[in-house]
């Protein structure tokens, strides 16, 4: 998918990019490739692949109608090089984006990236989701939490749902069908008062299958969740 294909596909979906937004995606690509030589950000560095498998893939929840250009508080867990939240932010500037990542070098990259792209209302924090999930400044504060290929739902639910307001939504982007994952996550979702409201499949323009699972938080998360760092992964609920 060339940049021009990317612009055209978005326009066909009703999203006509301004010259500023096109420049932001171009700068994003260049900085991603440049920084990838210093720290491991991505295995995908060829321009057409980045536009398809990072940029287009990241904004899929918007294209599929699951997010609006509103000043909602969005948290991205384990965003790595900023996916999916920063491409979403470029497309929908009204979003207020917070990223938590466990690697400080990635936070350095994201901080510089946001400055170079001129993004406002973006916040980056270094640390573990399990620790921030017990911090009152973060817990129960977000309208949406996104996670792209972070962990299976059984683990992911404990890392994300505590951050949501009641009625808030987890948007999980997956490359594989989530049916088996959701079966395994039934107990975790029950304990965390999360309800799957949508399990959506779609295709990238090249025909690759992708999946979005949306979980709504129904009640306040019990205080003991999330458990200490590492436990959700070692002993899933």
Curated annotation (Swiss-Prot):
EC number: 2.1.1.-
InterPro entries: rRNA_ssu_MeTfrase_G, SAM-dependent_MTases_sf
Disulphide connectivity of cysteines: none
CDD domains recorded: AdoMet_MTases
UniProt GO cellular component terms: cytosol
Compartment annotation: Cytoplasm
Keywords, comma-separated and alphabetical: Cytoplasm, Methyltransferase, rRNA processing, S-adenosyl-L-methionine, Transferase
Binding, S-adenosyl-L-methionine: 78, 83, 129-130, 148
Main location: cytoplasm
Family matches, as Pfam families: GidB (PF02527)
PANTHER family with a match to the protein in the record: S-ADENOSYL-L-METHIONINE-DEPENDENT METHYLTRANSFERASES SUPERFAMILY PROTEIN (PTHR31760:SF0)
Family of this protein: Belongs to the methyltransferase superfamily. RNA methyltransferase RsmG family.
Protein name listed in UniProt: Ribosomal RNA small subunit methyltransferase G
């Amino acid at each position: 998918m060339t940049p021009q294909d990317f612009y055209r596909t978005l326009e066909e979906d009703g999203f006509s990019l301004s010259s500023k937004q096109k420049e932001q995606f171009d700068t994003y690509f260049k900085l991603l490739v440049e920084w990838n030589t210093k720290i491991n950000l991505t295995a995908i560095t060829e321009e057409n692949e980045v536009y398809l498998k990072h940029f287009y893939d990241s904004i899929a929840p918007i294209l599929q109608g699951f997010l609006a250009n509103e000043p909602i508080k969005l948290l991205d867990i384990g965003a790595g090089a900023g996916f999916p939240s920063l491409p979403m932010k470029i497309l929908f500037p009204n979003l207020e984006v917070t990223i938590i990542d466990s690697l400080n070098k990635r936070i350095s990259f994201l901080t510089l990236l946001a400055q170079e792209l001129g993004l406002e209302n973006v916040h980056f924090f270094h640390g573990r989701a399990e620790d921030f999930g017990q911090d009152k400044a973060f817990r129960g504060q977000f309208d949406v939490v996104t996670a792209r290929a972070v962990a299976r739902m059984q683990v992911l639910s404990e890392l994300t749902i505590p951050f949501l307001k009641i009625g808030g939504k987890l948007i999980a982007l997956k490359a594989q069908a989530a049916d088996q994952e959701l079966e395994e996550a039934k107990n975790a979702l029950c304990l965390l008062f999360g309800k799957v409201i949508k399990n959506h499949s779609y295709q990238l323009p090249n025909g690759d299958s992708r999946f979005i699972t949306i979980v709504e938080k129904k009640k306040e998360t019990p205080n003991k969740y999330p458990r200490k760092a590492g436990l959700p992964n070692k002993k899933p609920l």
